[in-house]
Amino acid sequence: MKSVQGKTVLITGAAMGMGRLFAERAIAEKAKAVVLWDLNEAALQRTLEELTGRGTDVTAYLVDVGDLAAVEASAAAVLAEVGAVDVLVNNAGVVRGNQYFWESDSARDTRLTVAVNTLAPMYVARAFLPGMIAGPGEARLLNLASAAGFTANPRMAVYAASKWAVIGWSDSVRLELKQAGVEHVKVTTVCPYYVNTGMFDGAKSAPLLPILEPAHVVDEAWRAMCAGGSFVVLPRTVMLSEVLKGLVPIGVRDFISDNVIGVYHTMEDFTGRVEQQA
């Protein structure tokens, strides 16, 4: 697939940050329709107004993607009002950090993080994948995971767990589609380090792990998605943690991750932008 021209694209967490950039990219490529999902009503309305009138039909839905009933109802509305979705970008996410796990609030922190980061992409994909599979044209599922899904990291235990789960689920769906002989639907899993969207305000860069600019992440993710690529890991030095897991004892890995790569103290000054989409 060279571009999304003529296709219908749905993006979660679309009101700001990378979600909005994905929407702008789809419009620039002359998508037939772009559907924006978000829970921030004011930002969603503002983005809708600013993206309307650029040659693509843009619609917005106020959706709590962590609520299964809300996802199913909104998906039914999209299918009835807009039509089948060709490209689904699971971008919505939250991060709660700067606490040790035992200091966190199970209802406010753990439940929210798992609902939005882990369950939501599954709910949304389940709602639209059957139509993508049944459709005649090329289709894409782009899932935003995180570099945190590859390595343990202090002060973000639940976030890391939520992204580990997304990576396992997303790549398993890729394999299921392949095993089922569905050649026209491709799944791409994107795993960036901290992205400069405001969501990770206060998080530190590390010697081998710079804070990433959202436009760069969106460009790399979009290019891989269109090409049908399986994984995008940014920066590539993130994969050092995977290499270390298989080569050295855990104590040595911890020492290198802490003192050489420098990742274990990156969340100490985290403030974040609570309950905002990525």
Where are these regions (language model features)?
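Conserved glycine-rich Rossmann-like NAD(P)H-binding loop of the short-chain dehydrogenase/reductase
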Residues: 31-47
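Conserved mid-core segment of classical short-chain dehydrogenase/reductases
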Residues: 95-111, 155
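The beta1-alpha1 cofactor-binding region of Rossmann-like NAD(H)/NADP(H)-dependent oxidoreductases
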Residues: 41-42, 61-74, 107
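Active-site helix of classical SDR
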Residues: 125, 162
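C-terminal helical subdomain
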Residues: 189, 206-242, 246
